[in-house]
């Protein structure tokens, strides 16, 4: 399983938890990790070291590239985001649109947007852990790996559900309207869906008859022999020159 990390490398994003369990995760043999980002020097050096120590397990790009970030979102199977706090978070939403399942800590916007997988009902489109604890994070990663390797149909269904999740303003606006309606006690006006007006039978028959008559007329017109039109030369013909001949008088000799 390929796990992606696209983030600022800071404590707020939970990299102290990752640092604590990175050695164990690299030795687990069940995943590969790709990291993209810049931040605190200690974490930049941490990923440089592990990409040198486990070159076939971990790849670290200590930079930021929007183009590369989208390639990571698209290529990975899971996306790790163990933030200490997260007011909203966009990376988990972007990853879901690519069918990459987020592994997150239940805080702020991560808790609001990532519904954890329920093995009994099949609901959800991600994996989450509650406490800011490295062991819980690792256990959550292992749970995701178990589904990925041992229950492919469930994993594929989670991907479909993740890609179908809608966090657009259309949905948010509807929720705000419902909230204001509840607070104020003013009922929302019901949406009036107008059914398409069907033409009356008489009008429908009239249109059919007109179309039929028009097609009949076109057939008759096309069957007529073409009219031969004499085309006159618009330019006058040049006048013919007449030759004048003179008769010579001859005298007979006597």
Predicted features along the sequence, with ranges:
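Conserved donor-binding/catalytic core segment of Leloir-type glycosyltransferases
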Residues: 1-12
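Cofactor-binding loop segments of dinucleotide-utilizing enzymes, especially the Rossmann-like FAD-
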Residues: 8, 36-38, 63, 105, ...
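A conserved mid-protein helix/loop that constitutes part of the nucleotide-sugar donor-binding site
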Residues: 10-23
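Nucleotide-activated donor-binding/catalytic signature segment of Leloir-type glycosyltransferases, i.e.
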Residues: 29-71
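Catalytic binding pocket for nucleotide-activated donors in carbohydrate/polymer assembly enzymes
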Residues: 66, 71-166
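C-terminal amphipathic helix plus adjacent low-complexity
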Residues: 124-234
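Low-complexity, polybasic segments enriched for Lys interleaved with small residues
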Residues: 243-246, 250-251
């Amino acid at each position: 399983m390929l796990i992606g990390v696209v983030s600022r490398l800071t404590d707020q994003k939970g990299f102290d938890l990752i640092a604590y369990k990175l050695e164990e995760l690299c030795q687990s043999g069940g995943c590969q990790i790709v990291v993209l980002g810049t931040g605190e020097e200690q974490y930049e050096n941490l990923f440089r070291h592990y990409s040198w120590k486990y070159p076939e397990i971990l790849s670290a790009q200590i930079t930021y590239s929007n183009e590369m970030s989208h390639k990571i979102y698209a290529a990975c199977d899971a996306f790790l985001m163990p933030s200490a706090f997260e007011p909203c978070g966009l990376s988990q939403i972007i990853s879901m649109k690519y069918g990459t399942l987020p592994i997150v800590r239940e805080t702020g916007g991560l808790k609001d947007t990532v519904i954890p997988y329920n093995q009994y009902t099949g609901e959800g489109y991600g994996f989450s852990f509650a406490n800011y604890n490295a062991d819980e994070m690792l256990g959550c990663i292992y749970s995701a790996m178990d589904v990925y390797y041992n229950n492919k149909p469930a994993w594929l269904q989670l991907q479909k559900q993740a890609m179908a999740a809608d966090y657009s303003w259309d949905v948010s606006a509807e929720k705000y309207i419902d909230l204001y309606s509840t607070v104020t006690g003013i009922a929302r006006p019901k949406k009036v869906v107008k059914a398409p007006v069907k033409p009356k039978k008489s009008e429908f028959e009239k249109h059919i008859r007109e179309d039929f008559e028009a097609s009949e007329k076109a057939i008759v017109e096309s069957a007529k022999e073409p009219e031969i039109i004499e085309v006159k030369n618009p330019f006058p013909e040049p006048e013919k020159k007449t030759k004048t001949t003179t008769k010579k008088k001859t005298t007979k000799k006597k």
